[in-house]
Amino acid sequence: MKSGRFIGVMSGTSLDGVDVVLATIDEHRVAQLASLSWPIPVSLKQAVLDICQGQQLTLSQFGQLDTQLGRLFADAVNALLKEQNLQARDIVAIGCHGQTVWHEPTGVAPHTLQIGDNNQIVARTGITVVGDFRRRDIALGGQGAPLVPAFHHALLAHPTERRMVLNIGGIANLSLLITGQPVGGYDTGPGNMLMDAWIWRQAGKPYDKDAEWARAGKVILPLLQNMLCDPYFSQPAPKSTGREYFNYGWLERHLRHFPGGDPRDVQATLAELTAVTISEQVLLSGGCERLMVCGGGSRNPLLMARLAALLPGTEVTTTDAVGISGDDMEALAFAWLAWRTLAGLPGNLPSVTGASQETVLGAIFPANP
């Protein structure tokens, strides 16, 4: 069974940077050794945002974006190797999620698309890459997401305490770690995505630092109620979503009914939308004693305070409190999934994704010997 140093690479729907994590992984433990966040150039970020919102582009433009992202991921890995004074031979493999540009797991031909050419990463780092993690699960009738609950269960499940893990990235997803029950998990809806999109358009800021804008505003209750009527929120699990659904266009359609509002009030309403949709799903899933939060949203003091207020009787903490950096959780998960793929072990959980069976995930792009 393969064991040793692995690297995980994650560029999520928030597009707030490429997260790269170095860890030692074997069948008994996952030990994080180092991490860094690598910036995404503004032009590249905008190109991804455009395609995620349905903007048409030529096959040439699509191919160029795929190559550019692959090179970006390789640069991020090489920066971590240099920082840690490591060589390619010191790493077993890279687990690279890629950049999701479309996720449509239902319909006549279900599909998901992550780009960032893994061949570029192999060529530029000299390290074997495991990628394309989601499509096998979809081929077996699953949602292809979320995949991280399996990792959450391996690291954070407790024999007696009812626990849930909440990742608040662009999309928020919940892992249900309830003793005596199959592991559950699904996307609850928007996490940071709409908040980030709004403040970017209104103030040119990539995110609402320390929730300053949202805390200066007041929730627009009619707007909140209008958004909560979206059918996704009442859809039963398994379910998953992404930027192709919850995007700036979705927000604009709701705002048409409420013109002229203070931008800070809209920001406050979007923060409340994220908090309410998450807390409702926690309660509908039976509640928990401890909710452990990771992802960029765990650094949002307003979100954390609202979750605690909406979930009385639940201890709301970050995963940092149990020794796992909330900023690095997803990248670490894909390093772990790469280890499982090379070990020939399944990486999905049918109880989470709805797939017909467990399966080994991903495709392997081997480095030259």
UniProtKB/Swiss-Prot annotation:
Residues that hold ATP according to the record: G12, T13, S14, L15, D16, G17, V18, D19
Reactions performed catalytically: 1,6-anhydro-N-acetyl-beta-muramate + ATP + H2O = N-acetyl-D-muramate 6-phosphate + ADP + H(+)
Superkingdom field: Bacteria
Record keyword DNA repair present: no
SUPFAM superfamilies assigned to the protein according to its UniProt record, in alphabetical order: Actin-like ATPase domain
Sample GO molecular function, one term: phosphotransferase activity, alcohol group as acceptor
EC number assigned by the record: 2.7.1.170
Gene3D superfamilies linked to this entry: 3.30.420.40
One matching Pfam family: AnmK
Pathway: Amino-sugar metabolism; 1,6-anhydro-N-acetylmuramate degradation; Cell wall biogenesis; peptidoglycan recycling
Keywords: ATP-binding, Carbohydrate metabolism, Kinase, Nucleotide-binding, Transferase
GO biological process: 1,6-anhydro-N-acetyl-beta-muramic acid catabolic process; amino sugar metabolic process; peptidoglycan turnover
Transmembrane regions listed in the UniProt entry: none
InterPro entries: Anhydro_N_Ac-Mur_kinase, ATPase_NBD
Function: Catalyzes the specific phosphorylation of 1,6-anhydro-N-acetylmuramic acid (anhMurNAc) with the simultaneous cleavage of the 1,6-anhydro ring, generating MurNAc-6-P. Is required for the utilization of anhMurNAc either imported from the medium or derived from its own cell wall murein, and thus plays a role in cell wall recycling.
Family: Belongs to the anhydro-N-acetylmuramic acid kinase family.
NCBIfam families named in the record: PRK09585.1-1, PRK09585.1-3, PRK09585.3-2
The protein, known as: Anhydro-N-acetylmuramic acid kinase
Organism (species): Escherichia coli O6:K15:H31 (strain 536 / UPEC)
